[in-house]
Amino acid sequence: MSSQSHIPYAVRASRHSNPLARQLFQIAEEKKSNVVVSADVTTSKELLDLADRLGPYITVLKTHIDILTDLSPTTLTSLKSLASKHRFLLFEDRKFVDIGSTVQKQYHGGSLRISEWAHIVNCAMLAGPGIVDALAQTASTPEFRSVYANEVEGGRALLILAEMTSKGSMATGAYTQLSVEAARRHRAFVLGFVATRALNDVLPVSTVDGDEEDFVVFTTGVSLSASGDALGQQYQTPTSAVERGADFIISGRGIYAAEDPLEAVLRYREEGWKAYLERVKGWKA
């Protein structure tokens, strides 16, 4: 895969064919932030409080909405309002991993109503490429696009889980290659990958149908203090993640569980942005 990580966000925004990618890069440039907060909290109050306090300093808020013990329609309405107020995107870390017809119903329908509020979702490739085909099919229908593919809603997009940061992960080799192949078939809907690095060595190519590809890389497991935990999570620092090709760095406990989450998010923003500027400083048009 051809990485564009050496190019500034503003330039990538001006060139990108995916509307949500353009918006994402624009937000990052405006806020001088490449931080994604993984808000793995269990009550609506905690989630909405974090969204309101940290929203001005982040590009994306990542949720596991099904771990909320008191989820209600009001929670989702309030979350959307805060995303609009503070200009950040919502990423539901659902990791769809079922047959196509099932994930279509999980995404666009069901009790969580994910497509109605999440700008970004993700999937794993364990069920095969049909899962990406199915989600892209749903997102391409005239009915879906008329509701969500507009400036107010901001569009919808998919990240493919190409690699994981947990020790012993099987998301390697042929699995990662399959992820890239699936993304290339649906470039209008696939924003990029959740990966530990830029995937330059996976099916290298510079253009697709004459158009230079630019998949966005989100890296999880970013921490300023820890190297791992008792459950096999392996961490990178903001600097090392960006140096390895991360466009956006995802941190959870390092921010939301900090004594002062606001102070923590500012530290992550400062280090992540400094690493980004160092990465693109040699770029010339």
Curated annotation (Swiss-Prot):
Residue pairs linked by disulfide bridges in the UniProt entry: none
Active site: 95
GO cellular component: cytosol
CDD domains, per database record: OMP_decarboxylase_like
EC id: 4.1.1.23
Keywords, comma-separated and alphabetical: Decarboxylase, Lyase, Pyrimidine biosynthesis
GO MF annotations in UniProt: orotidine-5'-phosphate decarboxylase activity
Xref: Pfam families: OMPdecase
InterPro entries found in the cross-reference section: Aldolase_TIM, OMPdecase, OMPdecase_AS, OMPdeCOase_dom, RibuloseP-bd_barrel
UniProt keyword Nuclease, yes or no: no
Name by which UniProt lists this protein: Orotidine 5'-phosphate decarboxylase
